[in-house]
Amino acid sequence: REGAVRTEKRSHIPITELRVAGGGSQSPGAMQITADVFGLPVSKPHVYEASGLGAAIDVAVGLKLHPDFSTAVEEMTHLGETFEPDQKRHALYNDIFERVYKRMYKKLKPLYTEIREIID
């Protein structure tokens, strides 16, 4: 969530929805938690293998089946299930984020740096 907050600040563009693909998108529980944590609707694509769909879109544009990527994406992708945030749970997660996570991350940052040094 912290990354999303930073992205919004830097871009000055609010994030209004999330799209999730891959393994986590197959878990209704994980999708609902994501919606609740971010306080945003979270949708998954109509296909499981989003990378395969991306490759198919590339091929479709390359073969001139669609005139451009925007058209190909619009015609070849569809939303699957959407999970709406539960505002009561979002308020709880937000409280944890503001009161605990932000402080915890600052205190752990030196340890993350040390791990990076060990790995490098």
Task: Annotate each PLM feature.
Residues 1-120:
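Glycine/Thr-rich phosphate-binding loops that ligate phosphate moieties of nucleotide
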